[in-house]
């Protein structure tokens, strides 16, 4: 979707009284500290969690799931280029930068004030390891050369939902264009209430030969709101069996929903198109 003269993170480790609140370009933000760990809230919703003593630590389950996919996909390789559509505190970019020092990350954050503040308050590696680019994720994709990135992560939300122009078939086409041939797209989809992850998955299925998800069965059935992680790529790029085995070793075990089963879950839900949201598609 994360350098004052006196380092705020150092002061904040000792007391929750060091919690920080500030206004950004689009939201009200708060950083809550618990020892070395900080959670960024935007308009009261958890957005990022960072451990300043161990940036490879990932609090959120969906980020752990994405990391399992990337680790399986990489194999023995350690160098890759990642685009994160949605920056916030850059938790995933920081974790992967720590785990894979040869990797390079661009985090796109539409909120310029937020981008400046997270650089101020969190130990985010400097460019070229992690570069924060202020702008709209769709616009950045459309201006990026074909095959530039090996991993593209979409983890962008406003008021708890992903903006429509980041959920359409046309957006998915731009993602595939910018991905390297053996690259992977990882999408954090909200599901439940006003959010329908089936629509996000349907858009990916229109564009990518292989689409799978990681989801809690209760979330998939609509019993409660939660995250659905989608992975999209060319055939043969990821090993679903390997990913499934790794997911089962997590503190909270999970499983992969494979393409055939996923098609049944999505059946009857058409994908979102640019014209439905009056978004001007690129040529």
Which stretches of residues belong to each language-model region?
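Conserved beta-strand signature within the Rossmann-like core of class I S-adenosyl-L-methionine
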Residues: 182-189
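Conserved class I S-adenosyl-L-methionine
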Residues: 163, 189-206
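A short, flexible beta-alpha/helix-coil linker loop
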Residues: 45-49, 157-160, 185
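Short polybasic amphipathic segments
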Residues: 38-43
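SAM/dcSAM-binding transferase cores
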Residues: 2-33, 47-55, 72, 221-283
């Amino acid at each position: 979707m994360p350098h004052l003269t006196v380092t705020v993170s150092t002061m904040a480790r000792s007391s929750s009284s060091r919690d920080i609140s500030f206004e950004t370009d689009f939201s009200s933000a708060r950083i809550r500290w618990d020892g070395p760990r900080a959670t960024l809230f935007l308009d009261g919703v958890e957005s990022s969690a960072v451990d300043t003593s161990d940036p490879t630590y990932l609090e959120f389950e969906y980020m752990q799931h994405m990391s399992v996919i990337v680790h399986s996909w990489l194999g023995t390789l350690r160098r890759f280029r990642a685009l994160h559509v949605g920056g916030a505190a850059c938790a995933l970019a920081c974790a992967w930068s720590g785990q894979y020092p040869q990797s390079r990350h661009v985090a796109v954050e539409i909120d310029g004030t937020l981008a400046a503040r997270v650089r101020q308050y969190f130990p985010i590696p400097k460019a070229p390891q992690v570069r924060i680019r202020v702008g709209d994720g769709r616009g950045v994709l459309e201006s990026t050369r074909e095959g530039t990135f090996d991993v593209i992560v979409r983890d962008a939300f406003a008021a708890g939902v992903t903006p429509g122009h980041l959920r359409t078939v046309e957006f998915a086409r731009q993602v595939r264009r910018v991905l390297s041939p053996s690259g992977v797209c990882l999408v954090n989809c909200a599901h439940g209430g006003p959010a329908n992850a089936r629509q996000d998955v349907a858009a990916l299925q229109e564009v990518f030969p292989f689409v799978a998800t990681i989801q809690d069965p209760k979330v998939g059935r609509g019993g409660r709101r939660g995250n659905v992680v989608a992975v999209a790529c060319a055939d043969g790029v990821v090993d679903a069996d390997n990913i499934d085995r790794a997911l089962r070793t997590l503190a909270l075990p999970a499983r992969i929903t494979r393409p055939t089963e996923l098609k049944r879950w999505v059946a009857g839900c058409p994908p979102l198109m640019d014209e439905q949201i009056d978004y001007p598609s690129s040529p």
